Amino acid sequence: MHPDVKKRTLVWALAAAALVAAICAALVLTAGSWLSPIAKREILEALKRQYRGDVEIRSLDITFTPHPHATGEGLVFRAKDRAGAPPLFTLRRFEADAGWMGLLLSPHRISFLRLDGLEIHVARGAQQSPQAGAAGKPPAPSLVFEEVVADGTRLEILPLDASKLPLQFDIYKLSLTSPGAERPMHYRAQLRNAKPPGIIDANGDFGPWNALDPGQTGVTGKYLFSNADLSVFKGISGRLSSQGEFHGQLGKIEVNGETDTPDFEVSVGGHLMHLRTTFSATVDGTNGDTLLHPVNAQFGHTKVVAQGKIIGAQSGGHGVPGKTILLDASVQDGDVADILRMGVKSEPPPMNGRIRFHAKIRIPPGAGDIPDRLELNGQFEIAGGRFTNAKLEHTLSTISARTQGQTDGPTDNAAASDFQGNFVLRNGLMTLSGFSFHIPGATVRLDGAYGLKTEQLNFRGTVTTEVRLSQMTTGLKSKLLRMVDPIFSRHGTGAVIPIHIGGTRSSPTIGLDIKL
């Protein structure tokens, strides 16, 4: 070929290439004007298909240089099968980046997504349509988000019962990465806990998203909660740490964990104790309750086993809004001194011995101290019980000696041994009924009350003795008492004598209502 021809051919080729490049550049630079409406429509349709609902958006801007990029504000998504329910999610602002190849793939791949002000409202399936329920497997996703950052997210799981409080999770930091379509996303999250205040670190897997019933979306993970200040709950204090793992669905999560509080204190008792617990719980989104099954707690030489639930109620009627704790607790072989340290300031505690008890526990919501709101109803048995107050012990020893016909004074071993009774705690007042204990020569039965804060004692009852009144003294008094022996003797007993216990915890008074 002639050199001039080659030269003209090269010029034309370069010119054509330049023209094509110019056209492509013009198309890219002006893509926003003709591709944006198509892209907007495609994005909204993909969201509708993936999450099965209606999408509203206040603004959406898309650019294509140097790569596809979208920003939007005011996104609201409403599930079709949740008439009357809050939007499935609302979003204040978002930014998304994608590659050209990612957009051409099916499902479309979004390489990075930042979400600001995300609120998710997961309603359980009460209002799910028959068609949705019959669909079975959720539809395949139209979009895959490879990396998501959604700091400041709030997740709210709505119970079926509108009178119950929803479960709320305020997620301070949240990042997710996806390995591919129809596979769980891995997440790292920090949740800001309100009470007790602190940050919960969690990581695990989330999804795939269940568009038919979002509450059935799977979630697994581990958590760590450190240095939580319990003093925000009036009446108790200490620094709590907890760790554990969880699995299930958004609507029903199983949690297994443990807590450690080395400096736990109840204000009315004023004693520091090391409190450890292990627990298994179900966070039930269908009713907003947390089921505890069981909780094992240990402090000192005492182990407590409890099970129950934490329920929440909205404001309205005569109730107080908030969470109520309901527990069924028992101790099989505990140290009575450990129990008393919870509510009595003295050291040593008023009694030593081994205790067995069972109690119903209720802590309603409210602004008062926990010891004032705490409600107990149960029964107890104490084996080998012995009072530590020398004055009280001496008085009981004197009564024991008299009831055995020993008129020369008390012996050294006349201590109380076995106790049992029923107790009710309400408004800081411990009421005992059917309270009885044995001392050598007699059985004491009492009913009365003890104020946790006032420390006032007010008990009345009887002492049933093995010997008659006349045998508890000597001389002329003994002869005179023989005339009234039949009055005080009942059902074959020696005598039934009225008794009272009063005063305060630090200075108790005890005595018979007749003078021998």
Model-found features: residue ranges?
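N-terminal Sec-pathway targeting helices
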Residues: P3-A21
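Coil-to-alpha-helix initiation sites in intrinsically disordered, low-complexity, charged segments
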Residues: R8-T9, G99, T474-K479
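Terminal hydrophobic membrane-targeting helix
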Residues: C24-R124
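Small-residue helix/turn framework positions
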Residues: H67-P86, S111-F112, D116-H121, E147-V149, ...
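Short acidic, Gly/Pro-enriched loop/turn segments at secondary-structure junctions
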Residues: G102-S106, H121-Q131, E156-L165, T388-L392, ...
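Intrinsic-disorder/low-complexity linker and hinge segments
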Residues: S129-P141
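Gram-negative outer-membrane assembly/targeting C-terminal domains
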Residues: S506-L516
